[in-house]
């Protein structure tokens, strides 16, 4: 059994977290980006820490992990304030797993940052639509570029819209086009390297009345019978893109 598989099977992860592995393919995704136990990694806006559960133990002995979250004092959004507290508590309550994780707090609407030391990887999972909606996406990608070493990798996983979808509809639905993400990354100075279909889901038709949030894990606005139908689809169809800082 590989180290990463041992971590994924670990008792520090809840059954709820493990149930999402089948949709998120963490071993394949991190391997595609090139992350190893020796890597220095920045994880951007990790939410409740699903990927932190895997990255922190993987990197704690020979690598390093910085997670970038929104400063609760610099946002007026209650959800983000709550998320800040939940995430910090998660890390504080399990020092064995998360004791070496460093947290960098940034302003929600002015996310201009640079890590103290340049890193090998910047990773972001299912976040691009949020930055497009808030109008902060250019600043975020510029900050990624500043934080990476030359030759460093930006790894992006995001809900994938059909090609040609308008930006307005992308923001409304939570699904972004690959072309949009590639253009944003290119404008920040990144070179696109490759893509993977690891996180593709052909069952997702992307025409749900509540956008991507209709699907697991949110299932927003669904009746119980509808939830059962949508569980058969699984989580969203996702792009997995790899960029390099020249």
Where are these regions (language model features)?
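A short acidic, Gly/Pro-enriched loop at the edge of an enzyme's catalytic core
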Residues: 98, 112-122
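Class I SAM-dependent methyltransferase Rossmann-like catalytic core
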Residues: 3-37
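A short, conserved alpha-helix within the catalytic core of class I
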Residues: 105-109, 130-143
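S-adenosyl-L-methionine
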Residues: 79-111
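Conserved class I S-adenosyl-L-methionine
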Residues: 37-47
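Conserved beta-strand signature within the Rossmann-like core of class I S-adenosyl-L-methionine
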Residues: 65-68, 151-159
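A short glycine-rich, Lys/Arg-flanked "PGG" loop and its adjoining helix->strand segment in the class I
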Residues: 56-57, 137-150
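Core SAM-dependent methyltransferase catalytic element
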Residues: 205-246
């Amino acid at each position: 059994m590989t180290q990463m598989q041992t971590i994924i099977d670990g008792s520090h992860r809840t059954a709820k977290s493990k149930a999402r592995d089948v949709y998120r393919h963490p071993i394949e995704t991190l391997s595609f980006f090139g992350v190893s136990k020796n890597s220095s990694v920045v994880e951007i806006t990790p939410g409740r820490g699903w990927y932190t559960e895997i990255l922190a133990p993987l990197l704690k002995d020979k690598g390093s992990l910085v997670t970038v979250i929104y400063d609760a004092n610099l946002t007026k959004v209650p959800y983000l304030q709550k998320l800040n507290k939940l995430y910090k508590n998660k890390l504080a309550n399990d020092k064995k797993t998360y004791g070496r994780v460093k947290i960098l707090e940034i302003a929600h609407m002015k996310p201009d940052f640079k890590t103290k030391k340049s890193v090998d990887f910047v990773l972001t999972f299912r976040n691009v639509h949020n930055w497009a909606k808030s109008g902060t996406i250019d600043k975020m990608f510029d900050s990624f570029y500043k934080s990476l070493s030359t030759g460093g990798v930006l790894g992006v996983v995001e809900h994938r819209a059909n090609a040609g979808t308008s930006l307005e509809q992308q923001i409304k639905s939570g699904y972004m086009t690959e072309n949009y993400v590639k253009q944003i990354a290119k404008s920040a100075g990144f070179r696109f390297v490759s893509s993977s279909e690891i996180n593709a889901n052909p069952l997702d038709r992307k025409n749900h009345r509540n956008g991507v949030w209709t699907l697991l894990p949110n299932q927003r606005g669904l009746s119980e019978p509808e939830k059962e139908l949508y569980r058969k689809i699984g989580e969203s169809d996702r792009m997995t893109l790899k960029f390099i800082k020249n």
